[in-house]
Amino acid sequence: WSQAIVVEPKPGASGIIAADTITHTNKDSYTVLMTMPITHINNAILQPKLPYDPVKDFTPLSIVGTGGPMLVARADAPYNNLQEFIEYAKKSPKGLTYGTWGNGSAAHLFGELLKRQTGANLIHAPYKAEAAAHNDMFGGALDFAWANPSTARALMAGGKLKALAVSGTRRLSILPQVPTFTELGFKGFDIDSWIGFYGPAQMPPAVQEAWVSALTKITAMPDVAARLVSYGFEPLVSTPAQFAERYQRDYPRTAQLIKEAGATFQ
């Protein structure tokens, strides 16, 4: 494009701040939201009074990658696999506290689902960002945490972290040694997350088409695809219609997961 691309991070409130910003953007502008399911699915299910409507206030553009979080612990934790972790957690008098990047996030839901399925006392501690949770875990304030695969791989390479299991439908190519929850016998962990782009509502078709075309070309670039894989996401190019269809398919599945996990917005 002939215009500079400016990335403006807006962390906090489980993505609500960032998503709401787009609803106040001029529909003719080139400001879009790069997000994950939490802003449009998880928040919509858990919070009845969102400042935005996840469908009416946005224009779907494209999904560019799919993946999921993994359960991690300090390298010196007294367990080396998920079964040992569960046994340790059940024996802990006060339970184990874990950190995620927000209430209602996929990591939070999977943590609550694991708690339900194992009977272990797992206590959720939400943070504004993944790194803050990991810092507290390394400092001893948390017993374990969830991590995006790219973060986990870097910390594992540095000898600071061990990964016990990953969500999603298959093992990750960047960490093939880490088993999925599904293959370990747990149900409900096979929902893939995604990275998607949304524009504001009523975005002109020409602007929408320009964005979709650009995202399609960029995602197909070998270096971009490799970067997505390094982050633990499988590259994917979807049309706006396919994105909307994926949303309609994932919403009820996530609602059921939230119900099974007993997760609430705290």
Language-model features: locations:
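Hinge/capping helix and adjacent helix->loop/strand transition within the periplasmic-binding protein
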Residues: 21-31, 41, 45-132, 144, ...
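Short helices/loops that flank or line small-molecule/ion binding pockets
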Residues: 17-27, 113, 117, 131-141, ...
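Active-site-proximal beta-strand/loop segments in catalytic clefts of secreted hydrolases
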Residues: 9-11, 35-36, 101, 127-128, ...
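Paired acidic/hydrophobic, glycine-rich loop segments that form the ligand-binding mouth/hinge
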Residues: 29-35, 143-147, 163-165, 254-255
